[in-house]
From Swiss-Prot:
Keywords annotated in UniProt: Acyltransferase, Amino-acid biosynthesis, Cytoplasm, Diaminopimelate biosynthesis, Lysine biosynthesis, Magnesium, Metal-binding, Transferase
Protein's UniProt name: 2,3,4,5-tetrahydropyridine-2,6-dicarboxylate N-succinyltransferase
Residue positions of the active site: E206 (acyl-anhydride intermediate)
Keyword Transferase: yes
InterPro entries tied to this protein: DapD_actinobacteria, Hexapep, THDPS_M, THDPS_M_sf, Trimer_LpxA-like_sf, Type2_DapD
Lineage: Bacteria, Bacillati, Actinomycetota, Actinomycetes, Geodermatophilales
Organism listed in the record: Geodermatophilus obscurus (strain ATCC 25078 / DSM 43160 / JCM 3152 / CCUG 61914 / KCC A-0152 / KCTC 9177 / NBRC 13315 / NRRL B-3577 / G-20)
GO MF annotation: an example: magnesium ion binding
Involved pathway(s): Amino-acid biosynthesis; L-lysine biosynthesis via DAP pathway; LL-2,6-diaminopimelate from (S)-tetrahydrodipicolinate (succinylase route): step 1/3
HAMAP family: DapD_type2
Length: 324
């Protein structure tokens, strides 16, 4: 269950580090909120006896040097005393990403300030993470045989670290670690969920949920639909979608939707869009942000973008598709 006001967190995990000390990843199998009294803030390397006590007897064999990848896997304990403060290092960021994907915290409830500057560009391979700057696929294949490179990025696939209960993810490449997928969520092949974003209840995701975006229960993000984030382009609107909403195929929004709203297929509503109301007045879409029960559509005769009170129903989610 998501903690709406988390304060601190602790976890033991396995980190992949280079000879220069660069942290490529840290896997925390069982993160938890709250910090034991007297716990030392930051990340501490665990000794052989501590590994069994904190991670379990099966994890000791995973601590090793891997010459083929040029890395060492070490056991660590990370303590974050204040989740409202910005992350201080790479381990700190990785624990926060795990907290989100384990659904221990909800998107936007903890600080993720400065995460890009603390993460390393990594080649994510079937043999494990490799530093992108020194990656040599020929050397790796010579040592290990066939190796698949899934991508080169600072964020890995969520499914390689966390598989939340009660969800379907048709294509693991489309969901980043740090995504928050509520039980009953289905992410289809063309859906995408960024870190510090996601769903709060059963949802159909066939479009893009950008960083910082939260989608309420029983909402449908249609195929090719786009929800604007704030990572680039100067956007300042923090977008959320309420419960029971439909964002139609190839539609898009740069404003928040309240509950029970519909955006017609192919209709894009940015914060600065001029919207005609039923009384003939025209307002910026930002003035309608977060309101319940609206239908946004493009008038097929005049071409004007309109907002009307909702009537009827869009059909709602198919319960059989979300019994995961």
């Amino acid at each position: 269950m998501t903690d709406s006001a988390p304060h601190s967190a602790v976890a033991a995990g396995l980190a992949t580090v280079t000879p220069a000390g660069t942290v490529l990843d840290t896997w925390y199998p069982e993160p938890r909120l709250g910090v034991p009294a007297g716990a030392r803030p930051g990340t501490t390397r665990l000794g052989a006896l501590e590994i069994s006590g904190e991670l379990g007897p099966d994890y000791g064999g995973l601590v090793r040097r891997d010459e083929s990848r040029g890395v060492e896997v070490i056991a660590v304990r990370t303590v974050i005393p204040d989740l409202a403060a910005a992350p201080v290092d790479t381990h700190d960021v990785w624990l926060r990403l795990h907290l989100l994907s384990h659904r221990l915290v909800s998107p936007r409830s903890i600080s993720m300030d400065g995460v890009f500057g603390l993460l390393t560009n990594v080649a994510w391979t079937s043999a494990g993470p490799v530093e992108a700057a020194t990656f040599n696929v020929h050397r790796l294949r010579a040592a290990l045989g066939h190796v698949t490179v899934f991508g080169v990025d600072k964020f890995p696939r969520m499914v390689d670290y966390v598989i939340p209960s009660g969800v379907r993810v048709a294509d693991g490449d489309r969901v980043r670690l740090g995504a928050h997928l509520a039980e009953g969520t289905t992410v289809m092949h063309e859906g995408f969920v960024n870190y510090n974003a996601g769903t709060l209840g059963p949802s159909m995701v066939e479009g893009r949920i950008s960083a910082g975006v939260v989608v309420g229960p029983n909402s449908d993000i249609g195929g090719g639909a786009s929800i604007m984030g704030t990572l680039s382009g100067g956007g300042k609107q923090v977008v959320s979608i309420g419960s029971g909403c439909l964002l139609g195929a190839n539609a898009g929004i740069g404003i928040s939707l309240g509950d029970n709203c519909v955006v017609e297929a192919g209709c894009y509503v940015t914060a600065g869009s001029r919207v005609t109301l039923p009384d003939g007045s025209v307002v910026k879409a930002a003035e309608l942000s977060g309101r319940d029960g609206l239908l946004f559509r493009r008038n097929s005769v005049s071409g004007a973008l309109e907002a009307l009170p909702r009537t009827g129903t869009w059909g709602e989610l198919n319960a059989q598709l979300h019994a995961n």
